[in-house]
Amino acid sequence: MNQILARFTRQTWLSFPFGVQKMNFWRIKSPNYDSDYKDSYINGSLEHPYGLPGVECDVCGETWGGSRILPIECPEFYRKHKNITSAWPISRIEHESLQKELMDTLQIDSINEPFIGLRPGDEFQPCFLDVPSRPRADFLWASLGSLIVSERIKDIHVECCSSDITVCPVNIRKVGKRDAKLPPPMPFTGEPEDIINEVPITKNALEINSYFQILILKESGFPPGGTPRKTCSGCKRPDVDNSTRELRMTQEMWKGDKIFFLATTLHIVVTDEYKQLIERYRPTNIVFEKI
């Protein structure tokens, strides 16, 4: 357990000799769909019902919660805890107490400083997938901050970049009977996320191919203009000036990983090596955008 959290915080810096070939970096993302309905129809949505709430910090005055997904199962005892099933923010003191309880239960002692080992908004496993159509694609963009992939794509990641990721099972909860190639139905409410409530559902989820959640463990150095001006001594929230931050990747920011987050964002970035490897398998429902 301690090793899992350590991998989320470890940083590896590399130096580059003169004459090294300039690398390209790519953001991986979903294709552009005709409509939000098509997006929801193909990709569905992923739910993590258990997680840490947001925090109201009395030191910096900010109310916030992050989007980190942990590969750690929520302990059964906490699955009915009001502050684990609701993201509604609580005070910094309450948050610190809840974190200490969880770290004791999970036997996390190597990174036990409050707001470092665990953070506001952290989400636990398990996760549940609802897709209004029968999922066929290699990539499903059902979750921010992680990848939902077919078994063959999961196997490629485990083989080529196991030190950069960890893999969690996805529990398939609701799946529609229709093929995603058909036009998406218009839900009565008009909201794309409600399509799942108005389509015929496959009764036997075991008929659906397995999907897996890939969690990215690494991140780049800070982007130009994105170095935090300060970090709150209470909740450890970094203060980044979004007006000066540039959403681009440079070679100086790279730490040697094949897949990683662009620091201060949820943009998933990959190297040329990763792109070339994945493209050999002709994956579906993914695009590479130079960043």
Residue ranges and their predicted role:
Residues 37-50, 209-225:
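Short, intrinsically disordered, charge-biased short linear motifs at domain edges
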Residues 51-57, 229:
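Residues immediately within or flanking Cys/His clusters that coordinate Zn2+
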Residues 57-60, 232-235:
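Short cysteine-rich clusters marking metal-coordination/redox-active sites
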Residues 61-64, 239:
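Cys/His-rich microdomains that often coordinate metals
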Residues 74-106, 242-272, 277, 281:
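Short microdomains enriched in Cys/His and/or Lys/Arg
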Residues 97-143:
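Short N-terminal edge-element motif at the start of the domain
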Residues 145-147, 154-217:
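Extracellular-facing segments of soluble proteins and assemblies that are Gly/Ser/Thr-biased and enriched
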Residues 147-153, 268-273:
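Short coil/turn motifs at helix boundaries and re-entrant loops, enriched in small/polar
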